[in-house]
């Protein structure tokens, strides 16, 4: 997970649970050191950090963490270039964000994906179908995992119907040709054999009736 947006009512509780599973909250001067190690020039993520362990990352940053730490956490301060922790990190470093109402949470997802790169993915841990649909329709993401871990669910699982892949399409949002998980189908050549058929021409007045009713023809 790259960022976790948490309702204020459970923020402290979830933070403690994350610590129990091996998370360590990096704050103060250590947060600044970690940021400098991850983005030495202030914008480009360092190759020394990508896909590296907590041990390698903390040594590079010159900070100490408890033995057994599995991932690092930081509190999000701003979304955008003024706080690169809102960007994609490609490492066991997760940014925690707090929200009060769901509309704000949706906007935060929109802003984070907009800064990190539209078209990739997001997730939601909820049983509220209205919230699930709202997030899916408002965010420019190609995948949305519902009550699932992102890293495992996005790339395919027997229990979620997503095709197995190591390459995630991001659609035109991300400069790709498809929003699908790239798999064997996309490497197969298909020949379309077309025969003449009776014409079935759609009625434009019916198709655009709501638009014409609202704006005129």
Task: Outline where the language-model segments fall.
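Conserved C-terminal structural/oligomerization subdomain of aldehyde/semialdehyde dehydrogenase
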Residues: 63-217
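ALDH superfamily catalytic-core signature
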Residues: 1-80
